[in-house]
């Protein structure tokens, strides 16, 4: 991981002539491969798809890893917080401030207990539905307007098993579903951003 304060500072302060979007993969920093951090895994796949997998830069101002990626005439600010899930919103809100973005221009990618593994959904704002990372983002941005890509991880049968489930790693059987799921999630998100980049911001 490269760390470049000068690069990060220059990029964040430069105006971009086209549309710019922030895409945040929510998760627990230092816990890759867990179900709760699947949003960060999707961000990794997006970075690979757009050819910027080697461009992640640690930005101390927002306590996150950032990568800028072109998408047609638009630009994506990819963000993976270097914080625990329940304070991810601090990184997202700080990055939004640095890049001059509104809540409607921020996509959150996160795990979803109430969808089985392999299922995806695009949710256009709304409540956190019990997700601590989303709740943190809503609180720090003072808005619930952020579009969200929900990545199903399934809910365990017993309520007492939820914490161990989300903090646990995917089983070998689940791992087989992850590769195509990462591609599907990337397609869904990028297609939605492309469509919005061509029209008015309100066209969710």
Curated annotation (Swiss-Prot):
Listed CDD domains: PTH
InterPro entries given in the database record: Pept_tRNA_hydro, Pept_tRNA_hydro_CS, Pept_tRNA_hydro_sf
UniProt site positions, description: Stabilizes the basic form of H active site to accept a proton: 111
Positions contributing to tRNA binding: 86, 132
The keyword Coiled coil is annotated on this UniProt entry: no
Catalytic activity field: an N-acyl-L-alpha-aminoacyl-tRNA + H2O = an N-acyl-L-amino acid + a tRNA + H(+)
EC number: 3.1.1.29
Family listed: Belongs to the PTH family.
Protein name as catalogued: Probable peptidyl-tRNA hydrolase
Protein's organism: Mus musculus
Gene expressing this chain: Ptrh1
